[in-house]
């Protein structure tokens, strides 16, 4: 049977791939094949649709690739979880639904790199707005008619949220009313990708539901990509598996690789693009020796600081089996109640030292004491702060183990490999204890359950981090944008040295952003979609944004930053 032809083949129906599939098929004469190794996102599967059930997909393999790292040398040689989404929606189908864009200086930092000058925050902000419909309405920072439904936290959901934010302010840190607005730094309510009727707002819902009826879009699920086909240095198509059958599809224009920070470098390497020595070790014909493929891997590591709650206001009763049917019925029939929230409704970003130019620590507050993946629940009323560093200098890698497309790659993050990692985690634990000790939490705060008040010395804190810190599920940067020797793609996602091939997902970030990665991944896909379509970029924003400029980390005064005329004159 002759191979079918499409203008574009997209590998991976995740946070980025669904954006591209939707935007490219807005042009009716463009045909797109969207390949997804997982299955559909079933609308009536509470595990992926109910926000409060966010831990369930991580406990199985229907929606989770369930990768595992190699023994991490600085973490007691633990093999650590690396959950990634499998199915329409990708990781937006199983993530924690925290809508955090990152700090303005993340993007300004990207733009300081040669060739990435049009990735400033003010260049990116219009694409964040384009993607978003925020329930509180549009403004200079937020959109009102985009595919991603964003819900703001409402007062009165749980007294612990407001108390934890107030405790951060009492400890001397700023208050912010919008972690995605003028000022990220500080404590405040957290936006979430949840619809108005209490359902998860994955990209399969927001984007793909628009595009699915279009005759120029073909979606194939349970399609595991084997390799990208090349004619010389030009990508010409894809070989994928349907059961045991190998199927070939050809791309007239481009192949768009959107498989995430683990699978994108894995597929490139299996296709003959990557470090030449690695490829030759597996007898893979080298299409292009590109040393950065799979390198520069980054993630956020975090700890759970858990406390007993003296008042019965936590979510502990919701963990009891006898209470769950009523929660599920209310959510199913009304879209309200405990089931309709991811319960990460407050958080914050702080600088631990005055010389940090922008926040280096993130907080997620949760009114229950439990691991992110639903394990190790404390059998009492409790609450916790997830706390972790944002820009670790440690770097890892993704390396192919075999030519078998069903075998997971070798993954090593090298967590906590640098001295700065240890300093920031020690600071974070001690600062968190100061915050929790504030008067706002007096009526709720019981004993410290984890790490435990007896752990005070650097050595004790370090031992706790080695044994208990976990991934925040933010792998990124393994096919980095740029023009240095280790860069994989240019500023439009085009793979250096090849034609007809782009990578568009979190792997192309040159440096991890400050916070959760779903919103930045959607933004960069929106931005690159315009370039693929040959459309003029959206006009650069002129919205001001906060920069600390050396202000004290505690008690800092606001300093507005707007583009200087010379910066504003830059064009894409």
Swiss-Prot record:
Biological processes per GO annotation:
glycine betaine biosynthetic process from choline
Pathway involvement of the protein, from the record: Amine and polyamine biosynthesis; betaine biosynthesis via choline pathway; betaine aldehyde from choline (cytochrome c reductase route): step 1/1
Read off the Gene3D superfamilies from this record.
Answer: FAD/NAD(P)-binding domain (3.50.50.60), Glucose Oxidase, domain 3 (3.30.560.10)
Put simply, this protein is called: Oxygen-dependent choline dehydrogenase
Question: Which residues of the sequence carry a binding annotation for FAD?
Answer: 7-36
Please list the residues that make up the active site.
474 (proton acceptor)
Q: Which Pfam families match?
A: GMC_oxred_C (PF05199), GMC_oxred_N (PF00732)
Q: Name one GO molecular function term.
A: flavin adenine dinucleotide binding
Instruction: Alphabetically list the UniProt keywords.
Output: FAD, Flavoprotein, NAD, Oxidoreductase
Q: What is its EC number?
A: 1.1.99.1, 1.2.1.8
What are its cofactors?
A: FAD
């Amino acid at each position: 049977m002759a191979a079918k032809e499409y203008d574009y083949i997209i590998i991976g129906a995740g946070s980025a791939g669904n954006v591209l599939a939707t935007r490219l098929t807005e042009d009716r004469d463009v045909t797109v094949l969207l390949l997804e190794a997982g299955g559909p996102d079933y609308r009536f599967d509470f595990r992926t649709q109910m926000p409060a059930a966010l831990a369930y997909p991580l406990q199985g393999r229907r929606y989770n690739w369930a990768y595992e790292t190699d023994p991490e040398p600085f973490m007691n040689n633990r093999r650590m979880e690396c959950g990634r989404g499998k199915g329409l929606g990708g990781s937006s189908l199983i993530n924690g639904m925290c809508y955090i864009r990152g700090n303005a200086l993340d993007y300004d930092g990207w733009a300081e790199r040669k060739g990435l000058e049009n990735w400033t925050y003010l260049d990116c902000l219009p694409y964040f707005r384009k993607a978003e419909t925020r329930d509180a309405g549009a403004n200079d920072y937020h959109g009102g008619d985009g595919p991603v439904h964003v819900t703001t936290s409402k007062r009165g959901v749980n007294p612990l949220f407001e108390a934890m934010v107030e405790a951060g302010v009492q400890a001397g840190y700023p208050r912010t009313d919008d972690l995605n607005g003028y000022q990220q730094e500080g404590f405040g309510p957290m936006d979430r990708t949840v619809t108005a009727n209490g359902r998860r707002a994955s990209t399969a819902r927001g984007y793909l539901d628009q595009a699915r009826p279009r005759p120029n879009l073909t979606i194939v699920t349970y399609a595991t990509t084997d390799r990208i086909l090349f004619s010389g240095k030009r990508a010409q198509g894809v070989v994928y598996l349907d059961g045991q059958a190998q199927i070939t599809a050809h791309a007239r224009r481009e192949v768009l690789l959107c498989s995430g920070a683990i699978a994108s470098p894995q597929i490139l390497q299996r296709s003959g693009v990557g470090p030449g020595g690695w490829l030759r070790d597996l007898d893979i014909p080298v299409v292009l020796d590109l040393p950065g493929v799979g390198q520069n891997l980054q993630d956020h590591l975090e700890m759970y600081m858990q406390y007993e709650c003296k008042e019965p206001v936590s979510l502990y009763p919701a963990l009891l089996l006898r209470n769950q049917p009523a929660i599920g019925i209310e959510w199913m029939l009304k879209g309200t109640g405990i089931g309709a929230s991811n319960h990460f409704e407050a958080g914050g970003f702080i600088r631990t030292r005055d010389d940090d130019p922008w926040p280096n620590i993130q907080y997620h507050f949760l009114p229950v004491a439990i691991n992110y993946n639903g394990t190790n629940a404390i059998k009492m009323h409790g609450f916790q702060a997830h706390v972790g560093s944002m820009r670790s200098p440690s770097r890892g890698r993704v390396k192919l183990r075999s030519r078998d497309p069903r075998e997971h790659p070798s993954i090593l993050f090298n967590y906590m490999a640098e001295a700065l990692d240890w300093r920031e985690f020690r600071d974070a634990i001690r600062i968190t204890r100061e915050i929790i000790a504030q008067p706002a939490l007096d009526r709720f705060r019981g004993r410290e359950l984890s790490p435990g008040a007896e752990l005070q010395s650097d050595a004790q804190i370090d031992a706790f981090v080695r044994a208990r810190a976990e991934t925040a599920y933010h792998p990124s940067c393994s096919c980095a944008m740029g023009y240095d020797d280790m860069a994989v793609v240019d500023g439009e996602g085009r793979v250096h040295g090849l034609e007809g091939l782009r990578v568009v997902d979190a792997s192309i970030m040159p440096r991890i952003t400050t916070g959760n990665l779903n919103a930045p991944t959607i933004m960069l896909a929106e931005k690159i979609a315009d370039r693929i379509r040959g459309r003029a970029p959206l006009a650069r924003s002129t919205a001001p944004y906060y920069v600390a400029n050396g202000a004290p980390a505690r008690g800092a005064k606001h300093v507005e930053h707007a583009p200087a005329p010379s910066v504003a004159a830059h064009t894409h």
